[in-house]
Amino acid sequence: MNTSSILLVEDHAGFAKALLNMLAQNPNLQVVAVAESGEAALRYLRESRVDLVVLDYSLPDMSGVALLEKLQAEYPDLPCAMLSGHLSLQHARRALELGARGYMIKDDPLGILNGLPRILRGEIYVSEELRSLGSSDLQADLM
C-alpha cells in the first residue's frame, strides 16, 4: 500500500497532536496538514490534494456535518471520515447518509488506527463501541 495523505480537521490542538503521534505508528498514513476550522480545510483543499479528510464533528466556524456537505458537493470522490467525542447513533447515521465513509469515536484510538486504512480501501467503518449501542435495526442501518 502506498502512503495515503490525510487532512485532519480538528480545532483541539492537544487531540490533534495525540492523533498525529498515534497515526505515525502506521507508515502508510501521513497527515499532511491540520486545519483548525472548516474554512481552513476548504482553503487547503482548493490548493492541495489529499486521499482522505478526517474531520471533527464539532468545529468552531461550522458543524462537521456542514463541512461534510460542502466537501461532498465540491469533492464527491474524496473520502471523508467523521470523528466525534459523542457516542451517538443519530450523529453517525446522519454523517453516513451525507457521504462520510466512517464515523469514529475520539476516545477509541485503536478503532481510529484500524478504521482509517479500511476507509481508504473503500470500506465503511463505524467504531465498534458505537455499533454495540442501540437496536439491531440501527446497527443494520450503519453497516
Model-derived regions: residue spans:
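Conserved acidic carboxylate
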Residues: 10
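Acidic, metal-coordinating helix/loop segments flanking the phosphotransfer/catalytic sites
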Residues: 34-52
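Acidic catalytic/metal-coordinating carboxylates
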Residues: 37, 63-66
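Active-site residues of response regulator receiver
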Residues: 56, 84
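The feature encodes the CheY-like receiver
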Residues: 60
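Short amphipathic alpha-helix used as the core "switch/output" element in two-component signaling
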Residues: 65-77
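Short, flexible helix-to-coil linker/hinge segments that flank and couple to helix-turn-helix
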Residues: 92-97, 107-143
